[in-house]
UniProtKB/Swiss-Prot annotation:
One of its GO terms (cellular component) is plasma membrane. The lineage of its organism: Eukaryota, Metazoa, Chordata, Craniata, Vertebrata. One of its GO terms (biological process) is cellular response to glucocorticoid stimulus. It comes from Rattus norvegicus (Rat). The modification Phosphothreonine is found at residue 357. Phosphorylated. Phosphorylation increases upon somatostatin binding. GO terms for molecular function: G protein-coupled receptor activity; neuropeptide binding; signaling receptor binding; somatostatin receptor activity. This is Somatostatin receptor type 3.
Amino acid sequence: MAAVTYPSSVPTTLDPGNASSAWPLDTSLGNASAGTSLAGLAVSGILISLVYLVVCVVGLLGNSLVIYVVLRHTSSPSVTSVYILNLALADELFMLGLPFLAAQNALSYWPFGSLMCRLVMAVDGINQFTSIFCLTVMSVDRYLAVVHPTRSARWRTAPVARMVSAAVWVASAVVVLPVVVFSGVPRGMSTCHMQWPEPAAAWRTAFIIYTAALGFFGPLLVICLCYLLIVVKVRSTTRRVRAPSCQWVQAPACQRRRRSERRVTRMVVAVVALFVLCWMPFYLLNIVNVVCPLPEEPAFFGLYFLVVALPYANSCANPILYGFLSYRFKQGFRRILLRPSRRVRSQEPGSGPPEKTEEEEDEEEEERREEEERRMQRGQEMNGRLSQIAQPGPSGQQQRPCTGTAKEQQLLPQEATAGDKASTLSHL
């Protein structure tokens, strides 16, 4: 059986000598010797294509909604908003490979030509790795925000996040260079896949290990480590807050800490579980197929199809995790989706805004705290610039220090020294 590499690289005919990126499901669909009627294969291909198109539509709508909320309803984007924007963009572009995958399943051949094959596979791979790398970067950012909030404040800014996001896209493009070089539609075949030089088995195995390490196991290790340290930090902080002095003096703070611990724990479980659930079968099937070729029996079609669809389903679920679990995105979605009904309710007597939950209040409090930290950071930077201006000049004159807040600080005029007065009188 040929190796499984990218969700979109799914040839529908089997070439045991050189085909390298074939999905078992789609390869079997193109192989009439599997013992299944051609009519049954055609129906299966059409049904699978319809499922892919549904996943594509849902993913495009969800990620487009996230992108619109970030760009339209975020006046001053935070670090998390920048990463969510890039994640949604990568997931949305990742969805664009599904129509080509659906067409190849329905037609049992690639109708778009060799150049389009190479372009689709390259773009699909870039956005696949960008999506995974964005999840990893967001996990590192959450670790810095929770475990090292003070030391990381100067680095956790929107401009730095944009530069990191640009580096993620460049790194993803570099990682998929082998796809650009070796993908295409070989002569005598009608499918889009990767064709390795001899020895093809060694190249194929090396590429499977390469993509699995960079595309799953490496990011998973970083994500698990970050969230493990976050949980340890939150629990240690909660134990300090649960002290008797805190229970009597800072009861509201204790409650907020407990709610924050529960919220972070739920987010950790959701992120890690979804990531592992959607991507581990994909890469495990790759590795198993290298060690022991997978059977081409119709009984395994459902398993192969599920493994192909799960990575795309992860991109559909990301807007739910990173959008709907955030109060800020909830409000943005409500403004977009419930605008007509909200106008009707606003005309009804006694109607008011919905009551906020404890998590929403905690998130608003956290956003206010982050905004206050950003203002304090800007004030400290202003103080630093003013202190540099107030340093002694080349003539050795010392300027008086300023007092007041950062926004009110201005340099006071210097009093002339005795030498200056004498020099001035000599010129009169």
